[in-house]
A protein has these predicted regions:
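Periplasmic polypeptide-binding modules associated with outer-membrane biogenesis and secretion
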Residues: 1-148, 160, 177-184
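Hydrophobic, lipid-facing positions within transmembrane beta-strands of outer-membrane proteins
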Residues: 155-161
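Short loop/turn motifs that connect adjacent beta-strands in outer-membrane beta-barrel proteins
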Residues: 166-172
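A generic structural micro-feature
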Residues: 151-153
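Short amphipathic alpha-helical signal-transduction/dimerization elements
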Residues: 14, 165-166
């Protein structure tokens, strides 16, 4: 969240006496600004303070990723996380980055990755836990289609081999074979 974004949220509350209801609205607006930008675990709050100075101080706890864990968190799992997620441990937790990583994993047809965000050990930290119930990573299909031309033969026999995550990098390998079908 940029300084100008926060100034826009704070402006209506500046240079005036604020009631407790106004303070609640202020906090709500600031937290909404963080959430709207994807920072769902970042929170603003008011600490006890002396209001005789006629100013208030908002405290912001940045929501950070303690770790992103996949399955048993083996080296293979960590490699998959590294290649799928644009963020990692110690970074600000932006739900859009986490969703992007999940989408990268789920682009493989054999994956069904889901996430859960839970509190970390330190204030402001969260653990992103990924579970992935995979299906068979190999598929083989045969077919006949009429997408050929008169020069290649109208009917085409096809064979397709798809292998997901062969190198454990969220990779997809596809091998296609087409051949003109014989007319009987």
């Amino acid at each position: 969240v940029t300084t100008s974004d926060l100034q826009e949220v704070l402006f209506p509350f500046e240079q005036q006496c604020l009631t407790s209801s106004d303070l609640e609205s202020l906090l709500s607006n600031v937290n909404d600004a963080f959430r709207e930008r994807g920072f769902i675990t970042t929170r603003a709050y008011l600490r006890p303070q002396d209001l005789s100075e006629q100013s208030i101080t908002l405290t912001v706890i940045e929501g950070r990723i303690a770790e992103i864990m996949l399955g048993e968190d083996t080296l293979e799992d960590q490699t998959q996380v590294f290649f799928a997620f644009p963020t990692g441990s110690g970074e600000l937790l932006n739900i859009r980055d986490v969703e992007q990583g999940l989408d990268q994993m789920n682009r493989l047809s054999s994956n069904n990755a889901k996430m859960q965000i839970s509190p970390g050990e330190q204030p402001g930290q969260s653990v992103v836990s990924i579970t992935n119930e995979t299906e068979k990573p190999i598929s083989l299909t045969f077919g006949r289609e009429n997408s050929g031309s008169t020069t290649t033969g109208k009917l085409q026999n096809t064979a397709r081999l798809n292998v997901d995550n062969l190198m454990r990098l969220n990779d997809a390998w596809m091998l296609n074979y087409n051949r003109t079908a014989r007319n009987y």
